[in-house]
């Protein structure tokens, strides 16, 4: 996500890199500890369930922040023994007896493990195919220049002892292992190496390569050509090297792969790639990574991970720098960003959600399914790239954005096909199913973050992973353990805050006497969950949001039949008069309780916001309440008079305001950002945002509850649309409720697109933090009405609320050797 020499990132360094290479580090091991964070009455103030079991048994919180911040600013890449070996085999141009990169040979000599192997061979890690591949490559490289006789001997002994691993089809393997490993075996034989392996076993491995080259079991012809170019070093003279050069990047590399680039040079077809290898070996002091550059992908992954784990706010400055640089890469159509499907899609998603002014034009290259099928991603069944495309397609801001529409259509279809045909790896299946079930616009951040924390992989769990799309095991130096520790600590701290705020809200309910209203669906936990789950930034914003959710729900129930016509008219007049309510009086105790709950709470919110707003903004809250109850009264009068609006438009003129988003957002907006002037609240933009949010809520509600509301004698947009197209010569008599719902979904989709466009654009009268509230409200509404009206069947909502506020995390923290957070 960064240019190589950007200020935010130097472009990637190996930890401890020097001209003499990197000495492998040995890591201590200890039993892991199960950590459970209890909520409610059983809140644990620490995560201590064993030795040093704090929020992270190990580093101080500041040290964790510093390590993550360092990785964000300066990508740390693991050296690849496999790729370094191939680079070491490149001769000086015109002299096949002299190595072009002696520093790479020196690194190989200095980085052999005691057991004779090369690669990622940490204590406790079982010998795998990646280690065998790296070891054979390094042995062949040393033999190529007749150096390191003892190293070669120890390496050959290691290969002989573990060769059975190469033949084990159940062992995880790097991409293209059957081709790259057998190619090295052939090369080893030609260089005179005597492998301590039965010739029949060697022949068996080479035969596997022959079978793979002859069959067409994987992908399309185009994807197969791309894949064979990617693993071309394993093909030797079997490769069409002119065809490989079609995949050369501007930097001279083949797929940004040092090994593939080195192979094309060795075979005399890519001397322009020498500049690429010169740069990479110079930058890292001899060794090379498995892919370079990969700054953009590495940093975008870090940003995405921090956001998904709920700790991105602690790194806002670094993330801003990364996204600024990513935006520049995007605008300049840089290959590092645009030529990799997963990187491009992730960049688009993050940039759009952070308000950068980009169109979907950069995604046009993926508008056809063939963009996946004919690529390496398709050949390797790369589900993660496909899933990233699907996620990005959901961020449409324009109804006529056919690019994202087409991407979303085919990517969802392919993912579903892969699920039904069981072509998705078991470890990836939950994430795919979750993404298909829960679209981006219906995900509540805190709920998803808890899920991500509990499923997050530590470094220990990642030891046998990381082979996707890479020829040698790439694990990077992403501080997974530190990220997990901070996320657990932050979630635990947040739960303590949430529980205290919920207690305060329960006290407020009693103080306002709302609990005396028998009809009131108060549900403080569920309503507070909607504020906590979307990560409203301050306590005051969460409290104001929740109080008004409770109030609007209670008032809505009052207008739905619990109040008489006289009482309803009385409440509307009281709210209209506001401070002069004493002139009117109360028609009942119920009206008095409702009015004073609304009135006093609104005044308290406005007074609390005065230090931020530099004025008393209670008039805006009062006005939003008046619009709300006026719409509710109109709907109640329709119901009591058995009047059916003649058009959907007439119905929506009251139903939009009556959905009651106004008081909730207006109150919370006073606490989320800069001062909101009179002009902001009166602006066309603010009014349009409010109308969109209310319309989204109304349509979602109507589509889920129309059957119940018809029985209650209430009108509904779905029913009205069906009626308007079923008789009187005004439309098709065959129109049905399902057809009406489809039309409402189309209108809903258009409103959602327009809302996202307004929220993510980089200009506007309404400040971005305030605009974001409308999108958060839309996400809550989509979540609530995703399957059914969860306010009437609240088990699912209560379970979700408990997950965020009360239920303990179930997570395993890695061991550490020093202090706690």
From Swiss-Prot:
Annotated gene: KSL6
Record keywords, A-Z: Lyase, Magnesium, Metal-binding, Plant defense
The cofactor note reads: Binds 3 Mg(2+) ions per subunit.
> Which parts of this chain are annotated as the region Disordered?
1-23
The question of whether Lyase is a record keyword is answered with yes
Q: What else is known?
A: Phytoalexins are diterpenoid secondary metabolites involved in the defense mechanism of the plant and produced in response to attack (by a pathogen, elicitor or UV irradiation).
Q: Which reaction does it catalyse?
A: ent-copalyl diphosphate = ent-isokaurene + diphosphate
Comment, domains: The Asp-Asp-Xaa-Xaa-Asp/Glu (DDXXD/E) motif is important for the catalytic activity, presumably through binding to Mg(2+).
Please name the pathway. Secondary metabolite biosynthesis; terpenoid biosynthesis
Tissue pattern of expression reads: Expressed in roots and stems.
Per the Swiss-Prot or TrEMBL record, what residue ranges does the short sequence motif DDXXD motif cover? 556-560
What name has this protein been given in UniProt?
Ent-isokaur-15-ene synthase
């Amino acid at each position: 996500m960064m240019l190589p020499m950007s200020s935010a990132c130097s472009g990637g360094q190996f930890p401890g890199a020097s001209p003499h290479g990197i000495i492998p580090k040995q890591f201590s091991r200890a039993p892991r500890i199960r950590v459970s964070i209890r909520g409610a009455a059983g809140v644990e103030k620490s995560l201590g369930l064993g030795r040093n079991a704090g929020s992270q048994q190990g580093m101080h919180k500041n040290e964790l922040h510093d390590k993550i911040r360092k990785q964000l600013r300066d990508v740390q890449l693991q050296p690849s023994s496999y790729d370094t070996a191939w680079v070491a085999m490149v001769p000086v141009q015109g002299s096949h007896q002299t190595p072009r990169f002696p520093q790479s040979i020196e690194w190989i000599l200095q980085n052999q493990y005691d057991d004779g192997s090369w690669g990622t061979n940490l204590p406790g890690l079982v010998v795998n195919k990646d280690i065998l591949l790296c070891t054979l490559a390094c042995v062949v490289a040393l033999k190529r220049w007749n150096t390191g006789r003892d190293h070669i001997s120890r390496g050959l002994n290691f290969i002989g002892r573990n060769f059975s691993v190469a033949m084990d089809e159940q062992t995880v393997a790097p991409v293209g292992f059957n081709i790259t490993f057998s190619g090295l075996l052939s090369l080893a034989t030609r260089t005179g190496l005597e492998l301590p392996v039965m010739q029949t076993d060697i022949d068996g491995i080479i035969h596997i390569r022959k079978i793979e080259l002859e069959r067409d079991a994987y992908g399309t012809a185009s994807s197969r050509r791309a894949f064979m170019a990617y693993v071309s070093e394993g093909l030797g003279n079997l490769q069409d090297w002119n065809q490989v050069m079609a995949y050369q990047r501007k930097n001279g590399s083949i797929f940004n792969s040092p090994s593939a680039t080195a192979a094309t040079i060795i075979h005399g077809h890519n001397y322009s790639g020498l500049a690429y290898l010169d740069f990479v070996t110079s930058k890292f002091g001899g060794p090379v990574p498995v892919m370079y550059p990969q700054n953009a992908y590495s940093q975008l992954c870090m940003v995405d991970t921090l956001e998904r784990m709920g700790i991105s706010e602690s790194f806002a400055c670094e993330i801003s720098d990364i996204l600024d640089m990513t935006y520049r890469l995007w605008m300049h159509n840089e290959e590092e960003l645009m030529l990799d499907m997963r990187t491009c899609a992730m960049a688009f998603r993050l940039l759009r959600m952070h308000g950068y002014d980009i169109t979907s034009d950069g995604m046009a290259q993926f508008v056809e399914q063939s963009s996946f099928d004919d690529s390496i991603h398709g050949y390797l069944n790369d589900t993660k790239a496909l899933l990233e495309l699907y996620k990005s397609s959901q961020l449409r801001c324009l109804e006529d954005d056919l690019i994202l529409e087409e991407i979303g259509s085919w990517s969802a279809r392919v993912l579903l096909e892969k699920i039904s045909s069981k072509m998705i790896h078991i470890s990836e299946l939950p994430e795919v199913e979750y993404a298909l079930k829960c679209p981006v616009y219906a995900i509540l951040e805190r709920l998803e973050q808890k899920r991500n924390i509990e499923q997050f992989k530590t470094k220990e769990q990642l030891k046998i992973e990381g082979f996707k799309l890479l020829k040698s095991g790439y694990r990077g130096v992403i501080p997974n353990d530190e990220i997990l520790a901070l996320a657990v600590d932050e979630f635990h701290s947040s739960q303590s805050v949430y529980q205290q705020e919920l207690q305060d809200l329960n006290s407020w309910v009693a103080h306002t006497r709302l609990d005396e209203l028998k009809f009131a669906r108060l549900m403080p936990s569920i309503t507070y969950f909607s504020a906590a789950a979307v990560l409203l930034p301050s306590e005051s914003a969460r409290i104001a949001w929740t109080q008004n959710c409770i109030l609007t729900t209670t008032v809505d129930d009052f207008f739905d039949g619990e109040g008489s016509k006289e009482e309803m008219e009385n409440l509307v007049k009281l709210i209209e008069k506001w401070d002069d309510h004493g002139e009117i009086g109360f028609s009942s105790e119920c009206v008095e309780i409702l009015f004073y709950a609304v009135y006093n709470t609104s005044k308290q919110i406005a007074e609390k916001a005065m230090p931020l707003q530099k004025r008393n903004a209670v008039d805006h809250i009062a006005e939003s309440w008046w619009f709300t109850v006026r719409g509710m009264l109109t709907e109640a009068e329709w119901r009591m008079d058995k009047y059916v609006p003649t058009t959907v438009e007439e119905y929506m003129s009251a139903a939009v305001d009556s959905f009651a988003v106004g008081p909730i957002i207006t109150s919370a907006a006073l606490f989320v950002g800069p001062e909101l002037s009179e002009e902001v609240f009166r602006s066309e933009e603010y009014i349009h945002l409010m109308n969109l949010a209310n319309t989204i809520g109304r349509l979602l509600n109507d589509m889920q509850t129309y059957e119940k509301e018809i029985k209650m004698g209430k009108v509904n947009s779905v029913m009205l649309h069906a009626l308007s197209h079923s008789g009187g010569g005004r439309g098709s008599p065959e129109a049905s409720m399902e057809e009406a719902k489809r039309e409402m979904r189309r209108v809903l989709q258009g409103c959602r697109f327009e809302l996202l466009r307004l929220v993510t654009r980089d200009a506007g009268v309404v400040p971005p933090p305030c605009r974001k509230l409308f999108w958060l409200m839309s996400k809550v509404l989509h979540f609530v009405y995703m399957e059914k009206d969860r306010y009437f069947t609240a088990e699912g909502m209560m379970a979700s609320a408990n997950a965020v506020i009360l239920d303990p995390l179930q997570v395993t923290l890695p061991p550490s050797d020093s202090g706690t957070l």
